[in-house]
Amino acid sequence: MDAFRLAPCGPLRGRLRVPGDKSVTHRGLMLLALAEGEGRLFYPLKAGDTLSTARVLQALGAEVREEGPHFLVRGRGLRFQEPEDVLDCGNAGTLMRLLLGLLAGQEGLFAVLTGDASLRRRPMGRVVAPLRAMGARVDGREEGERAPLAVRGAPLRGLRYTLPVPSAQVKSALLLAGLFAEGVTEVEEPTPTRDHTERLFRHFGLPLEVEGRKVRTWRTGPFPAKDLVVPGDFSSAAFFLVAALVTPGSEVVVEGVGLNPTRTGLLTVLKAMGADLEWQVLEGEAGEPVGWVRARHSLLKGVAVDPGLIPLMVDEVPVLAAAAAWAEGETYIPGLSELRVKESDRVRAIAENLRALGVEVEEGPDWLRIRGGGVRPGRVRPFHDHRIAMAFAVAGLPVGVEVEEPHWAEISYPGFFQDLLRLCAAS
């Protein structure tokens, strides 16, 4: 089994820009594919998950072409063509769930959605059930709970739906379906989740009302394509921020990064742990705040994390665990039920890798209790999960670590290890 060995890293020094935001890239490609005319997606993420989105949209008749670091998209004007083959979503759960909403109202169109072994294990019933309540015709394994899933586009009616658990993917799938439904579609969230879909609806002039935690949309007519600049992905930036915090003498600045407040819960938690962090919003594109973040090495202390922050940092919990391993005292992270059904069972993956690095950890059904103080050199497993691979490269960086199957990082950050080594070498 291949492994990447990271020698102990001295201070990390330098500035960097991380790849484009994965969530915005997925959604931007989809909405441009629905639009009329031609639009460009500037500085998108070009990695495993988003390239799957580009290929699926091509199979549905949209023209998606790479132009240097950008995508050029010629849309279909609200009507996709029926694909000739199964639509392969790869490892991308966001793609599969949003695509269900996008296709549900394409009357008469038939499509089958599948993915890799990990994606075929992930729960889809949370999207399928409310779509069926709108009139969607969706079937699949375990009565639609698992892919492969078959969709036959049908007339949809608006729905008022309260999310049982916070999920930006379910919210987004229903909003996309609502663009083709008769009447109003309203989604109410128990707590706020990332709002990239709502911001992009505004960017493209699509129908949208937001009232507290309720979001509404309704049937749209044809809309023109618009260019879109994708900010750097905060979830990717988080690895370098934590690497700087836990490695003595380090100072790192991440520039051009998205600072959407529905994504930056990690900054709140790290500040509570005593992190030396500064950030500033400089500009916004398509309604997305963009700016810089500076991190300097800090002596962190354990904290009890507010469970209400978890939806605002759901993808950053693995790298928070890396920070907690170096913090003095105990860190308690509750509200992790959603992490059980990510690309891996992330609660288990975090616990097993912390133990492999000599860290004491307790694992509950939806919580972790981490007793920090430092890690020892070891070998970690990604469990086929890009964020686990990168988080535990960071956790072991100050003392040296071997990361099995490092290629999993390419799902969201193809140049991750090169960027990490460059910052180490800069000192």
UniProtKB/Swiss-Prot annotation:
Keywords, comma-separated and alphabetical: Amino-acid biosynthesis, Aromatic amino acid biosynthesis, Cytoplasm, Transferase
Catalyzed chemical reaction(s): 3-phosphoshikimate + phosphoenolpyruvate = 5-O-(1-carboxyvinyl)-3-phosphoshikimate + phosphate
Enzyme class, spelled out: transferase
Pfam families, A to Z: EPSP_synthase (PF00275)
List of residues binding 3-phosphoshikimate: K22, S23, R27, S167, Q169, D315, K342
Compartment(s): Cytoplasm
Superkingdom field: Bacteria
Primary subcellular site in the record, as a coarse category: cytoplasm
EC code: 2.5.1.19
Matching HAMAP family: EPSP_synth (MF_00210)
Assembly and oligomerization: Monomer.
PANTHER family, A to Z: AROM/DEHYDROQUINATE SYNTHASE, PENTAFUNCTIONAL AROM POLYPEPTIDE
Protein name as it appears in the record: 3-phosphoshikimate 1-carboxyvinyltransferase
Annotated organism of origin: Thermus thermophilus (strain ATCC 27634 / DSM 579 / HB8)
This protein's encoding gene: aroA
